[in-house]
Amino acid sequence: SVGFKAGVKEYKLTYYTPEYKTKDTDILAAFRVTPQPGVPPEEAGAAVAAESSTGTWTTVWTDGLTSLDRYKGRCYHIEPVPGEKDQYICYVAYPLDLFEEGSVTNMFTSIVGNVFGFKALRALRLEDLRVPPAYIKTFQGPPHGIQVERDKLNKYGRPLLGCTIKPKLGLSAKNYGRAVYECLRGGLDFTKDDENVNSQPFMRWRDRFLFCAEAIFKVQAETGEIKGHYLNATAGTCEEMIKRAVFARELGAPIVMHDYLTGGFTANTSLAHYCRDNGLLLHIHRAMHAVIDRQKNHGIHFRVLAKALRMSGGDHIHSGTVVGKLEGERDITLGFVDLLRDDFIEKDRSRGIYFTQDWVSLPGVLPVASGGIHVWHMPALTEIFGDDSVLQFGGGTLGHPWGNAPGAVANRVALEACVKARNEGRDLASEGNVIIREAAKWSLELSAACEVWKEIRFNFEAVDTLH
């Protein structure tokens, strides 16, 4: 009817459009929807589309002042989740004009800002996003990317090795710098500030930066290799964060670090722009991610947070290990590792990838495997992650019975042995233990490490499975 008719009407009349053909410029989202009892899936899917785009709970006369057809989100397909009762994957298409260019913050505010508290839904999870090339082209993306990083570091043909300095809190700046020196001197490429090391009473940031820089330059002079320490620039304000990054650059440090979820996407994108303009690499830690991504029926899957990070900007990001102490199922993890590194990723539901994603030459991000890993895991990690990755052993370096430098030596020897074996055509999956044992004959440090960690297992069922 012509004219405005007040009242509440069902969302599905406006926002459920199964006949809709998606456009190349649409942002597509796959939501796992669990409706309240009695709410049909079409209504639930339409409600998600409405509340995350143009809709509100009642008809408003100002709807007549705009073109809803041009701006509304549309739920265009619904399928039940196999093996789950009352769960559906609802596909929603959003017109590109709903989003500010170059703002991950605005994209998330729109798509996941309000709708997760919606009463008609028992639970809601954003499983995947297809970001169109037209939108990706408005982002700078990673400050440098994988190839530029290798060229800066002059390291090719193998994964990079890192180590988080432990104990994570409580060391003085000088002792912290000493631990950094020992690890890098033993053969690691990087050491890392823990995510919660910012600027506390026992170690202020400026002191830490100075002692770590001293360690880096001393080791570079002694080894002839380029080294780095991820200096955590995360701070309480964006201004303070940039101030720390500026100081790192003035010291000549090669890389800084940011906690992108606790720091926020706006801060992260600002830092990424600074890093590109000033030749700093940017390491990203995902502290707080499990709050958002761990429940399999509610929240946001990490593959979406990973895509968002590639748009916002970062050169490394933590991505689970598949084999250590933290969550990560193999196929799903490899799915978002590809989304981080590759330029074009085909839809593949067996790996949790709901949409084909074209990154149109946005630089790639190195996945970082970290958490409960040690020398016995090296063959599996080398095989699973390949060359373009960073393998980080915190306790697996510093827990060595002879100290930090021998711990670093053990890891470097194990890695070189695995890469050499792989290049000779050996199968790391079946021969991994043999390869490590052979290498241990030539390295007392590796032999001691093998002995310490031969019994360690973190065996729990994965929480995040596909069904």
UniProtKB/Swiss-Prot annotation:
Pfam families named among the record's database cross-references: RuBisCO_large, RuBisCO_large_N
Swiss-Prot/TrEMBL cofactor(s): Mg(2+)
N6,N6,N6-trimethyllysine, modified sites: K5
Sequence positions bearing N6-carboxylysine: K192
Catalytic activity from the UniProt record: 2 (2R)-3-phosphoglycerate + 2 H(+) = D-ribulose 1,5-bisphosphate + CO2 + H2O; D-ribulose 1,5-bisphosphate + O2 = 2-phosphoglycolate + (2R)-3-phosphoglycerate + 2 H(+)
Matching Gene3D superfamilies: Ribulose bisphosphate carboxylase, large subunit, C-terminal domain, RuBisCO large subunit, N-terminal domain
Family affiliation: Belongs to the RuBisCO large chain family. Type I subfamily.
Other remarks in the entry: The basic functional RuBisCO is composed of a large chain homodimer in a 'head-to-tail' conformation. In form I RuBisCO this homodimer is arranged in a barrel-like tetramer with the small subunits forming a tetrameric 'cap' on each end of the 'barrel'.
Function comment: RuBisCO catalyzes two reactions: the carboxylation of D-ribulose 1,5-bisphosphate, the primary event in carbon dioxide fixation, as well as the oxidative fragmentation of the pentose substrate in the photorespiration process. Both reactions occur simultaneously and in competition at the same active site.
Name the UniProt record assigns to this protein: Ribulose bisphosphate carboxylase large chain
